[in-house]
């Protein structure tokens, strides 16, 4: 295969659609570094694996020698992206946007090569725009064209309000491509309309229209809905290593292959096919593949040592292999006179309610430091430190404290083998 053919094979991996493919091939053959753009509105301070689908593709372009522009939409974030919404999104304040954006650089450079990345803010050009300039921009598209967007069309048909500023969002995102002279813009499949807007506006302004590359939306831990912090089905890239491992081990086998395609750098497309065949023939336990993926993710966001330690901690409890001293110790604040076991099970997040905790105790599914217990009144005082389990699937290593500095253990950190 030629160099260009190899590049295209890497670029195509996991991609949903490339428009126009022949233009991409022609620009790659030119031999010049392309400008690859992807925009992120800072609506939240933390990024999750769903965001890294685009970051990973950007990194692949960097590995091929191209220049990446990581665009922080501090201006567009104050408008609110209407994509996929059946109601108007609440705009963020300037303070919220800047606070969220301040956390992005440290996170994105866990994936991107800093030396081949421009970090830009779209307020650079929009804050210089006059009202006349904005009206001229708005004049470049029709309301009828905007209503071709699926979400706008549905809201219009159901008589849900569409606010005028929402029509401006695709135009403003498209104008970013003019300001940055983008060769390629990346986005989720839900962003296709906005990405094509950039292409149309570039052509209108005499620039070569950008190639549009859409990536699938990553399904979350449930394997159904797209990964979202609001749905709780996400893995944040700043989460502790043990949490990344345990959440990755929870995903279904079918979802595992999807994640490998979109998230893995180390498992090639060809190897993924071979692994899938081995699993189908029962020659390989899918758990081993998930462990490999989990190791890669933790290594990317932390380092190899953190990955080894987290996996050893997970194996110590779930498979009985290794040393459970490697598990992180979670502080749980309790009253000075202590807490009963039922309350501790709910307080730790192992059980959703006292009644469910009682049911598990009656089933003799609860263990403390490996010993089965069924006494709901068993009392624990501050200073207790140990491993509490419900079955083999859910467990937490705790230290009971009364300090005001302690933090209750969040549910997302529970280990669940299911």
From Swiss-Prot:
UniProt keyword list: Aminoacyl-tRNA synthetase, ATP-binding, Cytoplasm, Ligase, Nucleotide-binding, Protein biosynthesis, RNA-binding
PANTHER family from the UniProt entry: TYROSINE--TRNA LIGASE, TYROSYL-TRNA SYNTHETASE
Short motif ('HIGH' region): ranges: 42-51
Gene3D superfamilies named in the record: HUPs, RNA-binding S4 domain, Tyrosyl-Transfer RNA Synthetase
Record motif 'KMSKS' region, residues: 226-230
Signal peptide positions (record): none
Catalytic activity: tRNA(Tyr) + L-tyrosine + ATP = L-tyrosyl-tRNA(Tyr) + AMP + diphosphate + H(+)
Pfam families documented for this protein: tRNA-synt_1b (PF00579)
Entry GO terms, CC: cytosol
Enzyme class: ligase
Assembly with partners or alone: Homodimer.
Annotated residues for binding of ATP: 229
Entry's Gene Ontology molecular function annotations: ATP binding; RNA binding; tyrosine-tRNA ligase activity
SUPFAM superfamilies per the UniProt record, alphabetical: Alpha-L RNA-binding motif (SSF55174), Nucleotidylyl transferase (SSF52374)
Compartment list: Cytoplasm
Identification of the protein by name: Tyrosine--tRNA ligase
Family designation: Belongs to the class-I aminoacyl-tRNA synthetase family. TyrS type 2 subfamily.
GO biological process: tyrosyl-tRNA aminoacylation
Domain of life assignment: Bacteria
Disulfide cysteine pairs (residue numbers): none
UniProt domain S4 RNA-binding: residue ranges: 339-400
């Amino acid at each position: 295969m030629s160099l260009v053919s190899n590049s295209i094979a890497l670029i195509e991996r996991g991609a949903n659609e490339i428009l126009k493919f022949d233009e991409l091939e022609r620009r790659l053959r030119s031999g010049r570094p392309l400008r690859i753009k992807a925009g992120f509105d800072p609506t939240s301070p933390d990024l999750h694996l769903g965001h890294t689908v685009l970051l990973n593709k950007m990194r692949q372009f960097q590995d091929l020698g191209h220049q990446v522009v990581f665009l922080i939409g501090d201006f567009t974030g104050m408008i609110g992206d209407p994509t996929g919404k059946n109601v108007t999104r609440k705009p963020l304040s300037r303070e919220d946007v800047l606070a969220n954006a301040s956390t992005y650089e440290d996170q994105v450079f866990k994936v991107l090569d800093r030396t081949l990345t421009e970090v830009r803010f779209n307020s650079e050009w929009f804050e210089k725009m006059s009202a006349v300039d904005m009206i001229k921009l708005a004049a470049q598209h029709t309301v009828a064209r905007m209503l071709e967007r699926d979400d706008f069309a549905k809201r219009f048909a159901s008589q849900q309000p569409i606010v005028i500023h929402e029509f401006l969002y695709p135009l403003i995102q498209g104008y970013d491509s003019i300001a940055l002279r983008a060769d390629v813009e990346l986005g989720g499949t839900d962003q296709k309309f906005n990405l094509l807007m950039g292409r149309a506006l570039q052509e209108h302004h005499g620039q070569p229209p950008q190639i549009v590359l859409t990536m699938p939306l990553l399904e979350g831990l449930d394997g159904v809905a797209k990964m979202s912090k609001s749905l709780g089905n996400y893995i944040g890239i700043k989460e502790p290593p043990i949490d990344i491992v345990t959440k990755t081990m929870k995903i279904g086998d079918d979802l595992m292959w999807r994640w490998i395609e979109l998230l893995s750098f180390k498992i090639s497309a060809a190897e993924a096919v071979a692994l899938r065949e081995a699993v189908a023939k029962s020659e390989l336990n899918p758990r081993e593949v998930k462990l490999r993926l989990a190791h890669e993710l933790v290594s990317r966001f932390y380092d190899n040592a953190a990955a080894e330690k987290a996996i050893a901690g997970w194996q110590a409890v779930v498979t009985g292999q290794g040393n459970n001293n490697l598990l992180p110790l979670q502080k749980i604040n309790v009253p000075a006179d202590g807490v009963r076991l039922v309350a501790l099970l709910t307080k730790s997040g192992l059980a959703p309610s006292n009644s469910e905790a009682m049911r598990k105790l009656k089933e003799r599914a609860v263990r403390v430091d490996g010993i089965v217990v069924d006494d709901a009144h068993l009392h624990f005082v501050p200073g207790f430190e140990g491993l509490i389990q419900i079955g083999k699937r859910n467990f937490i290593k705790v230290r009971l404290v009364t300090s005001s500095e302690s933090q209750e253990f969040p549910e997302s950190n529970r280990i669940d083998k299911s």
